[in-house]
Amino acid sequence: MTDVAATDIAAYSFEKAVAELESIVARLERGDVALDESISIYERGELLKKHCEALLSAAENRIEKIRLDRAGKPVGAEPLDKD
């Protein structure tokens, strides 16, 4: 894959990247794609997968757990534990 393709993917939203990745998987599963094209779209799929993983990781890092006092009222937030 070219750097242009990676740059193109970097601008994708999570939803757009997942939709294209699903399309690639469907094409590869059908088996009606020439070998060279299969390799090319597989490589693009790998880039899309990595992009989705990075977006999910960034979102996970932004999520906070709300702390409650004894009465159950919110008193602040802290980073979500990674289990």
Swiss-Prot record:
It comes from the Bacteria. Keywords: Cytoplasm, Exonuclease, Hydrolase, Nuclease. Pfam families: Exonuc_VII_S. NCBIfam families: PRK00977.1-3, xseB. Heterooligomer composed of large and small subunits. Bidirectionally degrades single-stranded DNA into large acid-insoluble oligonucleotides, which are then degraded further into small acid-soluble oligonucleotides. Belongs to the XseB family. This is Exodeoxyribonuclease 7 small subunit. It comes from Allorhizobium ampelinum (strain ATCC BAA-846 / DSM 112012 / S4) (Agrobacterium vitis (strain S4)). The gene is xseB.
